[in-house]
Amino acid sequence: MKNFYKYLVAIFLITVIALPVQKVNAGNKDRAGQAGADELLINPWARSSGWGGANVSCIRGIEGIFNNVAGLAHTPKTEIVFSYADWMRGADIRLMSFGLSQRVGESGVFGFSFMSLNFGEIDITTIDLPDGGIGKFSPRYLNVNISYAKAFSNSIFGGLNVKVISESISDASASGIAFDAGIQYITGELENIKFGISLRNVGIGKMKFSGDGYSLQTMVPNNNNQFTTTQRGASFEIPTQLNIGAGYDFLFDGSRFTLAGAFISNSFKKDQFSLGGEFSFKEYVQLRASYTYEEGITKPITDPTRTNAERGFAGGLTVQVPLKKESKSVFAVDYSFRPMENFSSVHTIGVRFTL
């Protein structure tokens, strides 16, 4: 088991070191907006999104699939999560997610989740009919994750995730495959010192749109023959991300306060620093808040150095009740709040069953 863990760490570190070879320049602000599939950077979950990314070292359960899949290994037995958000309320963008994790054996956990973005209905326009009136179409994004995490000891946890990415409109679509990997390490006499590292969205090749939308039918000049031309869509990379974090649990009589922070290295946007805390009262009520900083985030939205609509703050609340006193089964309602600049804030609500 120890040798297996050493090999896992070695492979993980080699992957991190090899990123420059793949031309992934972390924290390069000049590359902002040049990647696709940016929905991979949106946390869809109601509980963990209140942390703002600071909880890479202490995330637990199915929501760990988002920023550190190693957290999946802490699933007691079975966990089911539903979440919903109006992304930038008023823009008619609906964000829905579902996750299911199941412990297998003494130390392994399988996980499955998906996130769907629905942009509502948009008028179809053409060159001849720029004002529409000929119908509507609905863009859709869908990300599906299949994960496995394992507890290698009482202190060491690791996980891998495979994600399938799909983006589509009525006459064009793009798809891709990416991988995540993560490790968590817990130490201290009370197991209250935590470290975590995760590598997210390592794509296999690039994504590219294709379909009938890239074809154009026209007439040959001075001829009655019709011909079709097909354009080639430009390929694009997905936003790889490296997260490194640490956390500490302050334990009181029946309560807990967790302080955690993380450095978030982005391949197609500015690097970020996230700090957050969570207070848990007897595991029945949990309050959390965080702040994620990046260069220019405090400047007006019209400033050219600002490239993020989020204000950096996030917060959340969880209320959970036990289903069985003799087990860890709980039913919980999670909520998070993320304010935006010049857009309506994002409110996410979810329900969670731990069986």
Give residue spans per PLM region:
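Bacterial N-terminal signal peptides that target proteins for export
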Residues: 1-9
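Subset of outer-membrane beta-barrel
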Residues: 23-355
